[in-house]
Every structure is written in structure tokens, then in C-alpha cells.
């Protein structure tokens, strides 16, 4: 699973490996949407996404300097930013639940927004990978 040192082109095994990572993230989203879990809960705490993030970190050094590096960064950032936004949503919603009872609504809307964002990032990244293109990392899409 290496990169050609002369051209910086990732080997086909690394491309396939990256497809597997997107597949695990997509599986977590689908299980969350179709099952009793939430999309966000399954994405952050379900085994498919946890395995995918571990796989990202395990092979991150092998994709450095290739177009796959953008995919690994995209996948890792998706996971950690989803976690961050869930924590922020929970911190904002908890006192609103206790004080006004509207925190349930802010919690649901916040987690729904994170779920849509996660699904968007998985789809956008996987489509770019299918086209053998890097994911353009724009900070506005975080």
C-alpha cells in the first residue's frame, strides 16, 4: 500500500483503502438513519466510523504528498468537527431544557444540522474520490 516515490501517485491499494473508509462512514450514516440510533450518534460512536478514523490515522503517513491526503484530512476533519458541533449543541441545549423546555428543540435541530452536514461531506468526498480528484478543502464548508 505505498505511493510511487517518483510521481507522488498513490497506489491502487491506497485508493481502494480510501473507498473502504468512505464506505464505513456511509454505513454509519445509513445505520443511524434506518435504525434506532441517530445519524450523529452512529457516526460519532458507532463502530464503522470509529474504525474508519483509526484507519485514517493508521495510513495517514502513506498518503502524504498525494491527492489522497486531501481525502484523509477531509474524513478526519468531518469526524472531529461533527463531535465538536455535537458538544456545542449539547452545551447550548442543556440549560435551555432546564430553564425553558425549548432545549429539546435546539438539541434536535442542532443534531439534525450536524447529520445533514456529515452526510453531505461523506457524499462530496466519495464522489471526488470516484473521480480520482482531491477534495478541495475550503474552510467555509466546515
Regions found by a protein language model. Name each.
Residues 16-53, 77-119:
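Hydrophobic alpha-helical transmembrane segments in multi-pass membrane proteins
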Amino acid at each position: 500500500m505505498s505511493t510511487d516515490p517518483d510521481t507522488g501517485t498513490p497506489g491502487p491499494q491506497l485508493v481502494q483503502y480510501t473507498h473502504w473508509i468512505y464506505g464505513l462512514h456511509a454505513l454509519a450514516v445509513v445505520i443511524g438513519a434506518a435504525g434506532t440510533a441517530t445519524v450523529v450518534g452512529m457516526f460519532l460512536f458507532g463502530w464503522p466510523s470509529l474504525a474508519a478514523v483509526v484507519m485514517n490515522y493508521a495510513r495517514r503517513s502513506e498518503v502524504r504528498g498525494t491527492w489522497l491526503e486531501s481525502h484523509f484530512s477531509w474524513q478526519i476533519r468531518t469526524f472531529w468537527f461533527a463531535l465538536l458541533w455535537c458538544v456545542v449543541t449539547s452545551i447550548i441545549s442543556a440549560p435551555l431544557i432546564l430553564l425553558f423546555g425549548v432545549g429539546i428543540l435546539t438539541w434536535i435541530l442542532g443534531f439534525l444540522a450536524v447529520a445533514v452536514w456529515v452526510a453531505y461531506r461523506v457524499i462530496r468526498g466519495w464522489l471526488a474520490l470516484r473521480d480520482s480528484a482531491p477534495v478541495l478543502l475550503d474552510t467555509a464548508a466546515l
